[in-house]
Amino acid sequence: MNIFPIVKYSVAEDSYTTDSSHINWSHYSDGGFTLSLTSGLLQIRQHEELIQSINLLDLWHQLIPGTKEKCLTLLSRAPCMNIRAFTNNVMKRFQVKFPSDVHYMKAKVEFEKLGLVFKDAKSSSEKKQFNNSQSQSNNSQELSLMNNAYNKSSAQQPNLLLQPSYIPMTQTATTAVNNSTNYVNPAPLQHVMPNAEIFSNTPPLKRFRGDAGMTQMPLRSDTSIESITASQQPTWDENVVITSSPFNPNRNAYSYGANSQYPIIAATPLNSQTQASWVAQPENQAYANLIPSPPTTSQILPTELTEEEKQLRSKVLFYLKQDSFIQLCQSLERVWNKM
């Protein structure tokens, strides 16, 4: 006979179901409790008075009617043991607590020698708390990963602040009449950008490198070529071609601005003896001997054009009249001045 001291004895009221969620327990810790195990017979006494007796081996090999569960369930969690025994259609539950883990391990060894196997004694509430803690831990890890990814993305795309800027623009136009050139100097155009903070989630921006670093400008909405109807097709003189320099149909020559370092070439009619005129500006005098005048189209293309070439020429001349092309030239001028 093996006898082990018990410091606490807990017993639940008998029930007719295996559900233990609504069962009242009684706890005794007055002392004088002992547990004895002899050939599978478990007995609990208090001051030599027998208060519990169960044959563990008989119940271990029996099943609860209508189920696949054994009539005996042993749960352990140092230094406690919980025993559930279904006998006489009644479920009995009681729990014992040993003075130390040493007494607990000695008693458990005696149970296992009989072929009895213990399960984990974590209650459903403890398992639920464990699962909740695991879920919260996983959620916190996921949130941490998401925050790290967001911070990393924000670090790679820093906020951009555009300060107000003043960009003067000057348009210089020439009009070729009777092989002579007249100069028109309109007032400078002022372009002021308001205070604005543009963050990384703003619409797409054009980027170009200036003297002060990377500068960004919003994309310009150009006129769609497909929106031009057939009724707007141009009617040009077949004997007029455009030169290789930028050209404004409203003015026979167009300058990129007062600070432009490139010459201005006027349109030259075909079969004409008049060569393209080069408009010299004060700022361009230093480049007069460095940059040659580009050849005109009349010097490159043959006098007789094919039908496809004529159609292509007409389309090019027509599109050059559009405001979108002029705006593009102005944008290129501003970009060039900043480079």
UniProtKB/Swiss-Prot annotation:
Q: Which InterPro entries match?
A: Meiotic_Rec114
Any one GO BP annotation for this protein: reciprocal meiotic recombination
* Keyword annotations: Meiosis
Q: Which cysteines are joined by disulfide bonds?
A: none
Name the job this protein performs: May be involved primarily in the early steps of meiotic recombination.
Q: Which GO terms describe its cellular component?
A: linear element; nucleus
Q: Which organism is it from?
A: Schizosaccharomyces pombe (strain 972 / ATCC 24843)
Q: Does the keyword ATP-binding apply?
A: no
| Keyword Transport among record annotations | no
Q: Return the protein name.
A: Meiotic recombination protein rec7
Under the heading Pfam families, the entry gives: Meiotic_rec114
